[in-house]
């Protein structure tokens, strides 16, 4: 029975975005939950940029207030603290991951604004479930609406106005962010997503299109995209039932996906990419969750280099859950890219990485 309870707890925490949050306050229609994790881990790799201590901690809260029987206000904030920096470096590399607030109108959906996940990640999240790696062929932080990003206004509707269980859709607008780094900038854009889940099976699709900033267009080079618009479309399938998790996604991007780095340390932006991800996992009752995945991103029309693989690896890993709060993991990223003139020019890593760690979460 105890082993079965561990499996149920693990399944629940994997399904929930915020794991086992501690309820700080719940009175008179106001609720505040605190959550966090300490992720103690080390990478082993011949790539000096990847090898070493990667420890960090995260802390966040989720709050909501019942305004009336039809209207609820909510907000969420999440911050990451690096644990592999010297004390003299202070908060260098620490970051705000999420910060948004919104209103939920009963069955009519919710609206929020701030730093949040782009709607394209509604599909990308299905394969971003590996013990440590994964979700890196096209879902990227601060790259338009493919991952966590800033200045997004999002409308979400669950169960299609309460009429069709499992049918969800979202619409999103992102305002212009013109930053120093062209690869993290974006113009005005919009995105759409829709998913349907029934008895463990899920199918979904997403699309987003944005203007590119003048600096992004002007940065065009042999390896940098020159298009005026950035686009992504993605589709996914998944099965999540009976302790089995299977998921696959396919996507294409235009003038969006970043890779490698130039002499100044800035990432290149590919003209076009075709991306495939697939993952399979099984949750044993005694807490072990083995995982295997394959991921590939092919860059198209990369100047004089033509078509090149940007990402390709097999991932083999496992997580062992002592209980819902404590786990340990190992994750082996078997890089299938070979050294070439392209990987050297674009500084694309071809080395394997092994990650091991302990994770405490509440």
Swiss-Prot record:
Keywords: Cell outer membrane, Ion transport, Membrane, Porin, Signal, Transmembrane, Transmembrane beta strand, Transport. GO terms for molecular function: porin activity. It comes from Salmonella typhimurium (strain 14028s / SGSC 2262). This is Outer membrane porin protein OmpD. GO terms for biological process: monoatomic ion transmembrane transport. Homotrimer. One of its GO terms (cellular component) is pore complex. It comes from the Bacteria. The lineage of its organism: Bacteria, Pseudomonadati, Pseudomonadota, Gammaproteobacteria, Enterobacterales. Disruption phenotype: Mutants show increased sensitivity to methyl viologen. Residues 1-21 form the signal peptide.
